[in-house]
């Protein structure tokens, strides 16, 4: 590689950084089914260096004063483990980090490459921002770059669709599976040692047991026992998510999981506000707006909802758009047995609300409806999005396998869209039952609409971005909102908005349950695009320098450790 990389061209600052893992920062490469109606194949242009400034910096701090000395030491070890997962993630999506960064002389460009974990802009449909690079490989580094879909699909190999291996070529040019535990053996052994060391400092026995099981899972590529233990762990004030978790980065098939780490501190007061909602999961599942066949699976009712402050993140969740809520584990068997844990990341959420969502609403939401933009509604919509991941259908009706496997690269976008819509359905039902009394339902609707504009800016390379493109177009066709041509602001039409929630919820659940890949691809192709009018409105946000997302100043020093 050249020792000096020059800045390539940047498209106009108004280029759609388009339509979030917000739930997990994601980067599936653009498919033919998710398009932006703008010229989109040229590298980004240097005339607008402000493209390098689309992220607002946020310091990750939280109160650790209530933790013991051992717990504070343990956090330091967990951060050390997280740094290693960051190194693995670089290898999964790019390769040699130092070779790339050392060759970039421009300071802002180098920083932008660090934010994106490579030379592709994750919030602009993965366009290259360095002129010597072409398109991002859809399969990242999970597969040989010269491997076609057909070659993989005709390959007779057990376990080829599993999450915890990479595909390489052997000396004869054939395909071979390499488990993560072997592909990244030195890093994984180092992480496991740190987790074992941290377990000795844990005040909570269940957390100590989880750390040991997670260390073993990393070394064996078998995560189910540790996922079960994680769900059984209820009382520890420190939370850790570590390992290969989400499959967004595999845009070729959506099979392979990328490494990441979250270190979080529980907000006990806010968590107590949320605890009562988990028990309603079975009742809400029964009431879903879809035929009974698509809601026959019953989620666990011992799932828990908690609020946290993020202390550190690394790897997948630190790339591109930042996660503000987590719903795990992803293992369908664990979900049915134990439910899921929903982690609301309060400090990240508040930063996005103040720095991004509120300014967007001031520009694009009708003035007389802006009073309905509230943090409680933003928090609630996000929380119930995560809860809604546990609702619906996990296995196709024909029994052929999981929805995730049937939908392939469209699985993430469809699942994120389902969670958004069913989350709003849950808000409706819980308000009707008197379980949610803060604010009013209109707050959730208007804040939800503003949130669509926020998430569309994550781009076609984001599962959340594509999900929001689909929803915007579906809602527009249904008359759920109206755009005022005189001032370019949008207004929620309540009756049509509520009907669109029911209709889209039904459509997404049916698509998932039927497991019809071609039907899903056609649906995403029809709805997953940005019109010229929407693009022009998004350009207005760029013109007044509203950040697209946030980046973290983080680490032990930031936390005072």
Predicted regions and their residues:
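Post-HEXXH active-site segment of zinc metalloproteases
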Residues: 393-417
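Active-site recognition of the HExxH zinc-binding catalytic motif
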Residues: 68, 377-394, 419, 424
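An active-site-proximal "capping" alpha-helix that borders the catalytic cofactor pocket
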Residues: 204, 412-429
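N-terminal helix-rich structural modules
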Residues: 37-210
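C-terminal motif of bacterial Sec signal peptides marking the signal peptidase cleavage site
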Residues: 15-18
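Extended, compositionally biased alpha-helical segments that mediate assembly or anchoring
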Residues: 505, 509-561
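Contiguous, non-catalytic segments that form substrate-binding/exosite surfaces or channel walls
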Residues: 180-370, 374
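Long, well-structured alpha-helical subdomains associated
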Residues: 424-522, 526
């Amino acid at each position: 590689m050249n020792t000096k990389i020059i800045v390539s061209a940047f498209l106009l600052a108004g280029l759609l950084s388009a339509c979030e893992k917000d739930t997990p920062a994601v980067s599936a490469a653009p498919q033919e089914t998710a398009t932006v109606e703008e010229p989109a194949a040229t590298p980004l242009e240097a005339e607008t260096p402000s493209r390098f400034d689309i992220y607002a910096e946020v310091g990750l701090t939280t109160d650790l004063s209530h933790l013991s000395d051992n717990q504070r030491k343990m956090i330091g070890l967990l951060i050390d483990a997280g740094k290693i997962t960051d190194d693995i993630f670089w290898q999964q999506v790019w390769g040699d980090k130092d070779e790339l960064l050392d060759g970039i002389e421009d300071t802002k460009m180098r920083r932008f490459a660090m934010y994106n974990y490579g030379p592709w802009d994750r919030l602009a449909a993965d366009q290259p921002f360095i002129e010597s690079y072409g398109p991002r490989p859809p399969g990242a580094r999970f597969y040989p770059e010269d491997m076609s879909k057909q070659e993989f699909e005709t390959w007779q190999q057990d376990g080829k669709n599993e999450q915890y291996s990479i595909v390489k070529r052997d000396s004869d040019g054939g395909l071979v599976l390499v488990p993560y535990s072997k592909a990244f053996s030195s890093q994984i052994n180092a992480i496991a040692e740190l987790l074992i060391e941290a377990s000795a400092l844990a005040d909570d026995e269940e957390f100590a047991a989880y750390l040991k099981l997670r260390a073993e899972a990393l070394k064996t590529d078998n995560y189910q026992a540790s996922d079960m233990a994680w769900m059984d762990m209820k009382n520890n004030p420190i939370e850790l998510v570590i390992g290969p978790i989400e499959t967004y980065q595999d845009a070729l098939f959506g099979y392979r999981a990328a490494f990441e780490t979250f270190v979080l501190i529980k907000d006990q007061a806010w968590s107590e506000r949320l605890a009562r909602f988990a028990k309603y999961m079975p009742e809400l599942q029964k009431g879903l707006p879809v035929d009974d066949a698509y809601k026959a699976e019953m989620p666990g009712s011992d799932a828990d909802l908690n609020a946290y402050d993020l202390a550190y993140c690394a790897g997948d969740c630190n790339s591109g758009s930042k996660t503000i809520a987590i719903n795990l584990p992803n293992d369908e068997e664990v979900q049915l047995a134990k439910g899921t844990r929903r982690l609301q990341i309060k400090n990240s959420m508040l930063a996005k609300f103040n720095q991004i969502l509120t300014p967007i609403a001031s520009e694009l939401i009708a003035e007389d409806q802006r009073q309905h933009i509230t943090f409680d509604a933003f928090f609630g919509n996000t929380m119930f999005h995560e809860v809604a991941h546990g609702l619906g259908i996990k296995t196709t009706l024909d029994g052929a396998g999981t929805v995730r496997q049937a939908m392939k690269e469209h699985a993430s976008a469809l699942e994120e869209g389902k969670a958004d819509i069913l989350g709003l359905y849950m808000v409706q039902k819980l308000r009707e039952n008197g379980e949610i009394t803060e604010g009013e339902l209109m707050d959730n609707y208007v804040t939800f609409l503003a949130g669509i504009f926020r998430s569309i800016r994550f781009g076609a390379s984001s599962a959340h971005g594509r999900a929001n493109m689909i929803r915007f177009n579906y809602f527009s066709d249904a008359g759920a909102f109206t755009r005022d041509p005189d001032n370019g602001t949008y207004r929620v039409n309540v009756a049509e908005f509520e009907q669109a929630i029911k209709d889209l919820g039904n459509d997404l659940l049916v698509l998932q349950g039927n497991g019809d890949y071609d039907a899903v691809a056609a649906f995403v192709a029809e709805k997953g695009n940005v019109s010229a009018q929407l693009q022009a409105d998004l350009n207005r946000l760029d013109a007044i320098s509203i950040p697209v997302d946030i980046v973290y100043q983080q680490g032990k020093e930031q936390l005072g450790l």
